[in-house]
UniProtKB/Swiss-Prot annotation:
Residues 78-88 have a biased composition (Basic residues). It is found in: Mitochondrion. The gene is AIM23. Keywords: Mitochondrion, Transit peptide. Residues 61-77 have a biased composition (Polar residues). InterPro entries: AIM23. Residues 55-88, 322-355 are annotated as: Disordered. This is Altered inheritance of mitochondria protein 23, mitochondrial. Residues 336-349 have a biased composition (Basic and acidic residues). Residues 1-30 form a transit peptide. GO terms for cellular component: mitochondrion. The keyword Translocase does not apply. The keyword Mitochondrion applies.
Length: 355
């Protein structure tokens, strides 16, 4: 009979099975064969489990090393990245003005730095009457918030992310009112978005009154031909329609801005010294406008000076006359109807008496 004998030897981290074959001269050995077969099966299963454990350990090690490598790469990339530039927090210490005036001024300064982080602004030089660039820090030096405030009257777009505002000094009360109106509009917008109040569509009474006034702007540097043709036509046309006309005359730099009316009404008067030629030019503009509207307007009302700016307020001549003519005609027709009715009554009475 052939008898299978197994020798087993354990090596570190693995099993090695040595199979030894030999001849056995004894009788049947079924029980020994079954026992040896179980040993073989158990050894094979143990080897399989150990192999899986080794493979799993290598995968975990690779995953861990990969994670550490990814973390190190992320740290390295974050280290190489430049930190984002934080917006500058500008703090201006005002030595004058009320708390409300300081809030209004800081609100304007904050708006300027949102337009460009360097704080670059434009201003009109009172001596040369030309637009110059400066910094808001320099512009606000020495101003008294008890008397004046800041106002953005126009904005020049430089590129997608940068714009330069045109800044002027206005009266303190004007700056405070504008700031209060802005805060009120912002609060109203928030309440509308929350659904607390509804947006009003009705026009106010002052808006209706303002609709009867037409506003035109003219620069002191206007050419005589443009004044006598284009502007003269605009003024006369509105007067013929029965509108009041306000003519705003200022320097070319100011009148060309987007918010020219706001700039005109709220800027602080700045008298400049005129040359002889400039004085003659400005006198010509005022005299020519008065000459153009002489036939269509009552006596013009002039407000301002040649050295700074001026408003010429015009009212149509025929407006009052037309109203009086219509009223007189209405009364005349009413009187005629009464007279005709009276005659009919008298005739009727006469016929009745005759019968």
């Amino acid at each position: 009979m052939l008898r299978l004998q197994l020798g087993k030897r354990i090596v570190r981290n693995a099993f090695s099975v040595v199979v030894i074959r030999g001849f056995c001269s004894s009788g049947p050995c079924r029980k020994d064969w079954m026992a040896n077969n179980d040993i073989l099966l158990n050894a094979t299963a143990a080897m399989k489990r150990n192999k899986e454990k080794v493979q799993r350990g290598s995968l975990d090690s690779a995953h861990t090393n990969g994670s550490f490598r990814q973390v190190n790469m992320n740290q390295r990339s974050n280290h190489n990245k430049k930190p984002l530039k934080k917006p500058r927090s500008i703090v201006i210490k005002w030595s004058t003005g009320s708390d409300r005036a300081k809030e209004a001024a800081n609100s304007t300064v904050s708006s300027i730095f949102k337009m460009n982080f360097e704080g670059t602004v434009q201003r009109i030089n009172s001596e040369t009457n030309k637009v110059e660039e400066t910094n808001i820090r320099e512009f606000v030096k020495g101003i008294n918030l008890d008397e004046v405030g800041l106002s953005i009257v126009d904005v020049s777009q430089i590129n997608e992310n940068t714009s330069i505002p045109l800044v002027k000094l206005v009266e303190a009360r004007v700056a405070l009112k504008r700031y209060s109106d802005e805060m009120a509009k912002q609060k109203e917008k928030e309440l509308i978005e929350m659904g607390v109040i509804k947006k009003s569509t009705k026009s106010s009474e002052p808006d209706k009154v303002e609709s009867t006034v037409k506003r035109l702007k003219i620069s002191w540097e206007i050419k005589p031909d443009d004044l006598c043709k284009q502007k003269a036509h605009e003024i006369v046309t509105q007067l013929k329609k029965g509108f009041k006309v306000f003519v705003y005359i200022d320097s070319k730099n100011s009148s060309g801005s987007r918010n020219w009316l706001d700039c005109f009404e709220n800027s602080i008067p700045q008298e400049i010294k005129l040359s002889k030629r400039e004085h003659e030019q400005r006198s010509f503009v005022v005299d020519k406008i008065s000459e153009i509207v002489e036939e269509y307007s009552i006596q013009p009302n002039l407000d301002g000076t040649l050295g700074d700016k001026m408003i010429i307020k015009l009212a149509p001549k025929t407006l009052t006359g037309e109203k009086m003519d219509k009223k007189t005609l209405k009364e005349h027709k009413k009187k005629e109807r009464q007279e005709k009715l009276q005659k009919r009554i008298e005739k009727k009475n006469q016929r009745g008496t005759g019968l």
